[in-house]
């Protein structure tokens, strides 16, 4: 079976292109994608098409840090019911467990691994995100989503990237506000145990359960 990806997150890439002054529509149309398709809830595309689109965009935008701009344009609805289940989670750990359990709603080749370490909870992102800007996008949205639930004062203990250090590395240091390492063995970030286990007033177990049930039906 061919792996597929949720199409709605492509809206983030569309907006990044526009932010750099590009007309996104013809770029997407070359891949057979229009904005009406992106706006259709639950619409999916093949892994090959998603990869081709990302490679085209990476070839157009000169700035190697463009993936970090995803944090400006993402919305929980881009990730279907997982985004809303995230918002309703009572702790960051609960939200991250959901993101790990239901990662396939975003991409059937996606995997998020969680591990408790002496430094805190380590979140390792999927090996399938081999294109550096795509990993940057995923990592920037992850910490943005954590800050959305927890508060803007949340900073990781440390952030690690497999890809090499770009000339714009200061943008990583500024955005994550934490030690950022490049040329490492895995793409991961660490959050303190006190942060991930803090009870959050935004939590709503009933709403979280409703969205969990929707995700389970969607993935069935």
Each model region followed by its residue ranges:
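N-terminal low-complexity or simple alpha-helical regulatory segments
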Residues: 1-121, 141
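Extended mid-to-C-terminal alpha-helical interaction segments
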Residues: 174-220
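Charged mid-protein connector segments
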Residues: 165-172
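Short, charged, low-complexity patches
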Residues: 132-135, 139, 204, 208
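Conserved short hydrophobic interaction patches
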Residues: 102, 141-145, 149, 214-217
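Short hinge/gating elements
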Residues: 79-85, 126-129, 196-197, 215-217
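Surface-exposed, interaction-prone regions with an acidic/low-complexity signature
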Residues: 1-9, 122, 131, 209-218
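Conserved binding/catalytic microenvironments
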Residues: 3-6, 25-26, 106-136, 144-165
């Amino acid at each position: 079976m061919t792996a597929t990806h949720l199409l709605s997150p492509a809206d983030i890439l569309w907006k990044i292109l526009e932010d750099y002054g590009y007309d996104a529509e013809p770029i997407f149309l070359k891949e057979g994608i229009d904005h009406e398709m992106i706006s259709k809830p639950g619409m999916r595309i093949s892994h090959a098409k998603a990869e081709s689109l990302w490679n085209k965009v990476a070839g157009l935008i000169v700035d190697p840090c463009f993936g970090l701009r995803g944090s400006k344009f993402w919305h929980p609805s881009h990730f279907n019911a997982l985004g809303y289940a995230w918002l309703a989670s009572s702790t960051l750990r609960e939200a991250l467990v959901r993101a790990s359990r239901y990662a396939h709603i975003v991409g059937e080749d996606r995997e998020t691994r969680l591990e408790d370490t002496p430094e805190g909870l380590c979140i390792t992102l999927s090996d399938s995100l081999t294109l550096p800007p795509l990993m940057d996008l995923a990592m920037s949205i992850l910490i943005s989503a954590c800050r959305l639930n927890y508060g803007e004062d949340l900073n990781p203990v440390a952030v690690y990237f497999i890809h090499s250090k770009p000339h714009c590395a200061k943008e990583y240091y500024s955005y994550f506000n934490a030690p950022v390492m490049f040329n490492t063995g895995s793409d991961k970030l660490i959050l303190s145990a006190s942060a991930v286990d803090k009870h959050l007033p935004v939590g709503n177990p009933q709403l979280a359960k409703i969205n969990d049930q929707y995700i389970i039906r969607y993935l069935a």
